From Swiss-Prot:
This is RNA-binding motif protein, X chromosome. Residues 61-80, 194-215, 241-274, 338-347, 380-391 have a biased composition (Basic and acidic residues). Residues 151-164 have a biased composition (Pro residues). It comes from Homo sapiens. The keyword Transit peptide does not apply. Changing K22A: Promotes cell proliferation. Inhibits transcriptional up-regulation of the TXNIP promoter. O-glycosylated. The gene is RBMX. The modification N6-acetyllysine is found at K30. One of its GO terms (cellular component) is nucleoplasm. Residues 8-86 form the RRM domain.
Amino acid sequence: MVEADRPGKLFIGGLNTETNEKALEAVFGKYGRIVEVLLMKDRETNKSRGFAFVTFESPADAKDAARDMNGKSLDGKAIKVEQATKPSFESGRRGPPPPPRSRGPPRGLRGGRGGSGGTRGPPSRGGHMDDGGYSMNFNMSSSRGPLPVKRGPPPRSGGPPPKRSAPSGPVRSSSGMGGRAPVSRGRDSYGGPPRREPLPSRRDVYLSPRDDGYSTKDSYSSRDYPSSRDTRDYAPPPRDYTYRDYGHSSSRDDYPSRGYSDRDGYGRDRDYSDHPSGGSYRDSYESYGNSRSAPPTRGPPPSYGGSSRYDDYSSSRDGYGGSRDSYSSSRSDLYSSGRDRVGRQERGLPPSMERGYPPPRDSYSSSSRGAPRGGGRGGSRSDRGGGRSRY
């Protein structure tokens, strides 16, 4: 960093405060012609600060003077004479500041991550998507394993289920999506455990995605619209679920509600979505979900079509309903339901909302309630109910 100020300029330090420019010029003048003598003085007192700069016309003269005078005594004080250098602050100053920035990114990531995590549960709705997304992403991607695990387990633990159960309608809605995830999770938990182990990968994966998956998928669906894909994945999975659920159906029956919840979660979420969200994305989700659950084929349309959505809902719902029904009924129902779903959807949509409302549906009801949206919904639900009854 040290640079010569300019050739021929010497720094003279350690001067006696009494030494003045004339004395310096007299002492250093013998080495060569001096261009400038600059004695540094205090601004206020005008007293010498003990150092000066002497500039020689010839750099060679300056070197000689520095060599001879350095360490010599002048006016009773040993002086220091050397090539003058530019103040370090001028040359050196610019560099340092930059470093601090690095922190930002991590934070973001952190945020994202945390966020997603955070979102996952509660934010259900938006979060949900995110959650889903995240979950999805997380789950699906890296996290999938982990998150799902997280996801799955907690549900197992019962954390989520409570969510599911406790939160009933509204919360569900919020939870709903969250619920959904949880639900799915729950599923994991419920159905999951049993199946989960076997399915884990799939389930986790799916579920994760699926559980999350649901959300995820939902997310996906909503997000990706892979509804078809979701549908695909889901649909089967749902079926799996369905089976699973069915299998577990009894438990799931509880679950059904839950399962439904799950589904309802879907459905419900759906509903929620409906109510809370307005269902929009939920719908979408639902649609997806529906599409998913519901016949995949339908899925795609559902994905976005609002109407289809409803239909989807209905259908899917029915699907769900069907599933539900299936749940209620059994796997076979499942199939039937699948069929029924379809049929039911057709028939189910309108059927009996009242019925739909029935307790079983409470969840639904809640959902449906939430869902005032369409008879379809209620209907499907009813169907569900009906389906249930049917089955």
